[in-house]
Amino acid sequence: MEPAFHAALSRGLAALALPVAPEALPRLERFADRLLAWNRKVNLTTITDPAEVAEKHLVDSLLLLPLLDEVRTLLDLGSGAGLPGVPLACARPALEVTCCDSVAKKVAFVKAVAAELDLPVRAFAVRAEGDPEGEKLPRADAVVSRALSDPERWVPLGVRYLAPGGTLFAMLGREADEARLAAIGAASGLALVDVSRFELPLSRSARAIARWRAR
């Protein structure tokens, strides 16, 4: 991978104080390399500049890392090319990650890269519609989606996949109204824990992550 990738990844991790161990960096680089290689044959991402991949896929995914606390299992719904699930597994190999997406070629990529990197990641080609048993998807300590960024759609769906005492995350690409997020969570029996705000250092793009738990 070219120097711009390494510079963007290092700068993002340092600027945001993300707890990524040095031994995780080769896994993250390999994931990015395989993502771009597969993308030449199948459409996995519109972001192809290596520095942008580092910031907008890897660093953006890893914003969740300090918020996972004692989470042991994570379900990534609508994961696409495994984002954020695979980068999180790269950084925290003890985390058991399940990715699901309705697009078979994206699921095939996630399975292949997880096997190549020896990560505890499972992937299923299924559309999540709120029936974990029927869809054969596990309930998890943490449930997240980058694909569904509208909390009014995401929260009522995601809550159905939470294990008892679990945490639901919404990854938002814009400023978030905490009163609105609290009300959305309350309608699904969840209490808003907090909203963490970030700025990606290269693009200056705003990010917010909302976190809810059962009342």
Swiss-Prot record:
Keywords: Cytoplasm, Methyltransferase, rRNA processing, S-adenosyl-L-methionine, Transferase. One of its GO terms (cellular component) is cytosol. It catalyses: guanosine(527) in 16S rRNA + S-adenosyl-L-methionine = N(7)-methylguanosine(527) in 16S rRNA + S-adenosyl-L-homocysteine. Gene3D superfamilies: Vaccinia Virus protein VP39. Its main location: cytoplasm. Its EC number is 2.1.1.170. InterPro entries: rRNA_ssu_MeTfrase_G, SAM-dependent_MTases_sf. It is found in: Cytoplasm. PANTHER family: S-ADENOSYL-L-METHIONINE-DEPENDENT METHYLTRANSFERASES SUPERFAMILY PROTEIN. Specifically methylates the N7 position of guanine in position 527 of 16S rRNA. This is Ribosomal RNA small subunit methyltransferase G. It comes from Anaeromyxobacter sp. (strain Fw109-5).
